[in-house]
Amino acid sequence: LGHSDADVLLHAIMDALLGAMGLGDIGMHFPDTDNQYKDISSVELLKRTFEICKKAGLKNVINLDFTIICQKPKLIGCFPEMKKNISAVLGSPVERINLKASTTEGLGFEGRGEGITVNGVILVE
């Protein structure tokens, strides 16, 4: 249902970065009303977001910790590759990138397989 490739984890990381720097959210920077962002890679958007934040004074991302809440798919086996990809963009050591997965045990929209929630924190300098 997303305008870009709708990678919910990377979108949450982008929003956290922008929020930490007081720069709004991804919808302000990459509006879904602008066709140049239609089907764009979320990795590319993360790169652009990181550049925006660096121009605003971000020195580095010290660590991040995000939880993906969905019934399916089971994601834990994907985490090493996901962490490597995030590290490549943000320059943070893989050891400082923590990803977790949880379910709602069948409850709510996540439990019915209708959507995914991502919560997290990011520490920046």
Task: Write out the residue ranges for each language-model feature.
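Short, intrinsically disordered/low-complexity patches at protein termini
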Residues: 43, 100, 122-123
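C-terminal edge-of-domain segments
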Residues: 110-125
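Short, conserved loop-to-beta-strand elements that form functional interface hotspots
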Residues: 65-70, 74, 80-110
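RNase III-family endoribonuclease catalytic core
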Residues: 1-79, 90
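Mid-sequence acidic-hydrophobic segments that form the walls
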Residues: 52, 85, 89, 123
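Surface-exposed beta-strand edges and their flanking turn/coil or helix-capping segments
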Residues: 1-3, 81-83, 112-114
